[in-house]
């Protein structure tokens, strides 16, 4: 039996005995409780430790979000799962991410740019999430091949994410916003406080030369598209050249599924129930026998 409940029941008995000796007034009798409404706690494991006596001070410490330290790993896993669910629901155009097999704190991704200065660019990246997420700093986003851009470090390939998220606020900022920001920088160029001063100066002073270097950067990134991932992981995003034997069948299945979905949605729209009789503008004017199935 849990020592915490033994201690509590003993203290209750002592208080009741003292109250009987001291009190001289009429006793108040509470109405009897029905046994059916009595709640019981689940069984306590044999090696369980009372919550009033932590094993060590470190276990009684709470994180900044008020979560007990022993729940930290579970809370982190739940937070990351919720974040990935939000990413899927947002359906960011041209952005695809996949959490790592080895660590949920590392996500692999790729951005497809369809128009603008960086048109036809395919940029692979990795997102690094702090181990104290969501209470730490903002996640980091590093491109596999440094892109020629004012906000991308020309050596490390890291994007200046802190520009958009100076202070990461839990329950307000989300990873999908970081991904959207990474996509937006290729369509809206910002040159203030750049990580790549050369790119910023060329964009301001010589746009044609800037465009030329961007084209070269896009070609460089695309030339490394089929390289093996820098981080060995079963869930890393890998591209391979088009193979008709493998890819034609998959392509046909995807197109067939898309066509089937479009036909179903179109059929539902045409044959849906209507409460207006053809040729009439009055609501609820459809004949009753037409509603029978």
From Swiss-Prot:
CDD domains for the chain: UEV_AKTIP (cd23814)
Organism of derivation: Xenopus laevis (African clawed frog)
Domain of life: Eukaryota
Listed GO biological process terms: apoptotic process; early endosome to late endosome transport; endosome organization; endosome to lysosome transport; lysosome organization; protein transport
Stated family: Belongs to the ubiquitin-conjugating enzyme family. FTS subfamily.
Membrane topology per record: Peripheral membrane protein
Function field: May function to promote vesicle trafficking and/or fusion. May also regulate apoptosis.
Biased composition (Basic and acidic residues): 14-23, 256-266
Pfam family of the protein (one): UQ_con
UniProt keywords, alphabetically: Apoptosis, Cell membrane, Cytoplasm, Membrane, Protein transport, Transport
Protein name stated in the entry: AKT-interacting protein homolog A
Region called Disordered, residue ranges: 1-45, 256-293
Domain UBC core: 75-223
Compartments reported by the entry: Cytoplasm; Cell membrane
GO CC annotations, alphabetized: FHF complex; plasma membrane
Biased composition (Polar residues): 1-11, 24-38
InterPro entries found in the cross-reference section: Ub_conjugating_enzyme, UBQ-conjugat_E2_core, UBQ-conjugating_enzyme/RWD
Primary location class: cytoplasm
């Amino acid at each position: 039996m849990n020592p915490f409940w033994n201690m509590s029941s003993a203290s209750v008995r002592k208080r009741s005995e003292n109250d009987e000796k001291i009190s001289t007034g009429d006793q108040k009798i509470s109405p009897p409780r029905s046994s059916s409404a009595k709640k019981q706690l689940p069984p306590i494991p044999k090696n369980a430790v009372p919550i009033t006596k932590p094993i060590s001070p470190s276990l009684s410490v709470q994180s900044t979000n008020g979560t007990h330290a022993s729940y930290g790993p579970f809370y982190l896993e739940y937070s990351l799962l919720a974040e990935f669910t939000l990413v899927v629901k947002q359906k960011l155009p041209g952005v695809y991410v996949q959490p790592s097999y080895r660590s949920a704190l590392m996500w692999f991704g790729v951005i497809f740019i369809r128009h603008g200065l960086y048109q036809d660019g395919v940029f692979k990246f990795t997102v690094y999430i702090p181990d104290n997420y969501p209470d730490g700093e903002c996640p980091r986003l590093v491109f596999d091949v440094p892109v020629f851009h004012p906000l991308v470090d020309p050596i490390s390939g890291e994007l200046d994410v802190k520009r958009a998220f100076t202070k990461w606020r839990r329950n307000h900022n989300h990873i999908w916003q970081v991904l959207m920001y990474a996509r937006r920088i290729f369509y809206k160029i910002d040159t203030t406080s750049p990580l790549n001063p050369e790119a910023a100066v060329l964009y301001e002073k010589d746009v044609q030369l800037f465009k030329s270097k961007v084209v070269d950067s896009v070609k460089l990134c695309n030339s490394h598209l089929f390289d093996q991932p820098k981080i060995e992981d079963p869930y890393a995003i890998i591209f391979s050249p088009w193979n008709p034997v493998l890819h034609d069948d998959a392509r046909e299945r995807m197109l067939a599924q898309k066509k089937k979905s479009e036909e179903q949605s179109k059929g539902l729209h045409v044959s849906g129930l209507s409460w207006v009789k053809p040729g009439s503008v009055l609501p609820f004017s459809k004949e009753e026998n037409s509603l029978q199935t």
